[in-house]
């Protein structure tokens, strides 16, 4: 096999934020912004990243962390070797239009992309679910980021014009059609999520502790009555998760009924719950949500971990650019960050 090219999408989470680490419900979609990897077999690893304008070379017996983008590649190689797959090196380049650090899962997109390149080059025949789990393991155990399964699952299982309703405990999922005349306006605030890793870890710790106190395996099993048994801060945070799980189910039903106005209202409610009770928003994300609603969006909320990164708004397809331009103009007049927006739609998952 000579050179192959793999397209690996980013993802947006429509609803179900901060629920995946308590095995709750999520509703992500793969989006039409991609990491593109072109590569061939090689006796070592030699990869050029267009984004970083940097080439890295190493051998398979030297999988030590460097604290840079190449760790995602090393993590995938490490996990494949650990699992007993017979692989060699690769030589190629990484390009694409998926922005990094914008809360659109560029890391999961990159990991799954590299995994798929190796899967193709070395005929590994890895099934889709295994791909998502291996990429997650690489990020958790090698790179050292305690993410849930949401991102990798969306990148692998994405389907054009559909969102994915996923139970992160059983990994059972369902495709739900997304209206073709509605666009997802993704607004990158330009705020780097420096807080995200420490605060995310803290939210995760409190959520996991809450499950232990209640003797439950998943947030799906937790009732209003159970919440009374938790200490005040745990109760405040965990009650958000319980409400968010319920909202994912409501959005699923509203999408099936074609009620985009109801979907929008639920998204906006979710944002203010994240802001006021889970405390993961920031002034810039709140500004976007308010402006989007003023300009006629169906609904808007932060997407991803929060503390910066990106927010989304559901808008009529033919108004997306007008609304995006107007928000960006007002945002740049108020804040000094380098913000930008993208108009995306649900797309297929990773593929050649």
Curated annotation (Swiss-Prot):
Optimum pH is 5.0. It is an enzyme of class 2 (transferase). One of its GO terms (molecular function) is galactokinase activity. It catalyses: alpha-D-galactose + ATP = alpha-D-galactose 1-phosphate + ADP + H(+). Transmembrane segments: none annotated. It is found in: Cytoplasm. Its EC number is 2.7.1.6. Pathway: Carbohydrate metabolism; galactose metabolism. Optimum temperature is 90 degrees Celsius. Mg(2+) binds at residues 107, 139. Its main location: cytoplasm. Substrate binds at residues 17-20, 200. ATP binds at residues 49, 101-107. GO terms for biological process: galactose metabolic process. PROSITE patterns: GALACTOKINASE, GHMP_KINASES_ATP. Disulfide bonds: none annotated. GO terms for cellular component: cytosol. Belongs to the GHMP kinase family. GalK subfamily. Catalyzes the transfer of the gamma-phosphate of ATP to D-galactose to form alpha-D-galactose-1-phosphate (Gal-1-P). Is very specific for its substrate, since it is not able to use D-glucose, D-fructose, D-mannose, 2-deoxy-D-glucose, and D-glucosamine as substrates. This is Galactokinase.
